[in-house]
């Protein structure tokens, strides 16, 4: 394979990675609704705007980080679309499963997963489903396989329709919104800590 062919192939894979990540951002935004539903509703217009900006900024950032840290290097190291799509689908499935577990845990307990909370979750699950550990594990594995199948479909769809997706000109405006929301939510949080926090 010539140098230009390899460069074009890698550019196409990276472009595919952007669209695959965008689709996962939408999925993460939907999962993020569980967090919003688990907390008290905002009482003012400004707090509602902050909630929306924070929701978009944070849940768009999660898949983006997975892309930059895990998928992007594979685009350079393994420039084979079938292998890359499989790896990306597996990585995305694992990340989304972790997000779903955290969202459901947050909904039930009011705090995020950590070393203590995993032990608490296992203890509560064992108490709730006494003697049914096998069923729980089987359900989790089945759920993961369904999600992995969905991610593989998503990876293949975005690959096969890449040229159509690129012509939609949705990427730049969506990226602008995600980046602005991310920086706005963090800036507001820093400002609030500096101005309103009273130890």
Describe the function of each predicted region.
Residues 2-199:
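Transmembrane and membrane-interface helices of multi-pass
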